[in-house]
Amino acid sequence: MLMITSFANPRVAQAFVDYMATQGVILTIQQHNQSDVWLADESQAERVRAELARFLENPADPRYLAASWQAGHTGSGLHYRRYPFFAALRERAGPVTWVMMIACVVVFIAMQILGDQEVMLWLAWPFDPTLKFEFWRYFTHALMHFSLMHILFNLLWWWYLGGAVEKRLGSGKLIVITLISALLSGYVQQKFSGPWFGGLSGVVYALMGYVWLRGERDPQSGIYLQRGLIIFALIWIVAGWFDLFGMSMANGAHIAGLAVGLAMAFVDSLNARKRK
């Protein structure tokens, strides 16, 4: 099967599927974060994409509405899935996403009980030459958060972006992005501020860059990030760099993470194009 496109609005997706059915082409919809349209007979891909281009120019054209009437999908037959809060969390997060979230929460609780300094002595970037072979330190700095707002903000983005990557591209891809971005963003940040820093934001920015550029260059990957959100991320970096909000931010980690994510997305999308 071949994924043709994704629609944010499930009714629009259904309208296109109904119209193609009247043209003798069977498409199916799979609901994830968006409504993904799949084609079973890949020999019809060129024809479907041509029709999709015409559809996107004017989805409200009467012929599409007529097709929906013919297929019987204009009423309330389209069912929207409703999830309780925790069910929604489970639906959009794979095992790696969950393990990271749980690890961050456990470390945060430990920091509240034992104190920041005690936990940092074990998890911070190597702050002494004798610690350079304690390899976990190059990654575990990402688990430490210093306020409730800090951890909530990072874990929300981690769940949203990391969950999408894991669901679409697999746990292995999320692990690779996480490890590389934690290592490189941590390296850059310690050059800026020394070893006493923490937080998942370097990884989050890597995921932002990765999901946005991979979605732009390889829509069939099934991941995407609205351009408004990547613009927000850039504004946040600028605000942090110039200390506009009076908050201590790991600016080096943010910039390095974003660069890592963009670079990995460029390489992966290039490889995806070569395979076609």
Swiss-Prot record:
Query: Catalytic site residues?
Result: 201, 254
Listed result of changing residue 254 to A/C: Loss of catalytic activity
Q: Which reaction does it catalyse?
A: Cleaves type-1 transmembrane domains using a catalytic dyad composed of serine and histidine that are contributed by different transmembrane domains
* Function statement: Rhomboid-type serine protease that catalyzes intramembrane proteolysis.
PANTHER family assigned: RHOMBOID PROTEASE GLPG (PTHR43066:SF26), RHOMBOID-RELATED PROTEIN (PTHR43066)
Question: Periplasmic side: which ranges?
Answer: 115-141, 190-191, 246-249
Supply the Pfam families for this chain. Answer: Rhomboid, Rhomboid_N
Any one cellular component term from GO for this entry?
A: plasma membrane
Where found in the cell?
Answer: Cell inner membrane
UniProt keyword terms in alphabetical order: Cell inner membrane, Cell membrane, Hydrolase, Membrane, Protease, Serine protease, Transmembrane, Transmembrane helix
Residues exposed to the Cytoplasmic side: 1-93, 163-168, 213-222, 273-276
EC no. given is: 3.4.21.105
Question: Which protein is depicted?
Answer: Rhomboid protease GlpG
Q: HAMAP family under this entry? A: Rhomboid_GlpG
Q: Which organism is it from?
A: Escherichia coli (strain K12)
Q: What is known of its domains?
A: The loop between transmembrane domains 5 and 6 is flexible and may readily open to the extracellular side to allow water entry into the active site cavity.
The family assignment reads: Belongs to the peptidase S54 family.
Residue ranges spanning the membrane: these are 94-114, 142-162, 169-189, 192-212, 223-245, 250-272
A GO biological-process term? proteolysis
Cell inner membrane among keywords: yes
- Determine if Cell membrane is one of this entry's keywords: yes
The GO terms this record gives for MF are: endopeptidase activity; identical protein binding; serine-type endopeptidase activity
Q: Which NCBIfam families match?
A: PRK10907.1, rhombo_GlpG
Name the reported effect of residue 199 to C.
Answer: Loss of catalytic activity
Topology in the lipid bilayer is annotated as: Multi-pass membrane protein
User: In terms of domain of life, where is this protein from?
Assistant: Bacteria
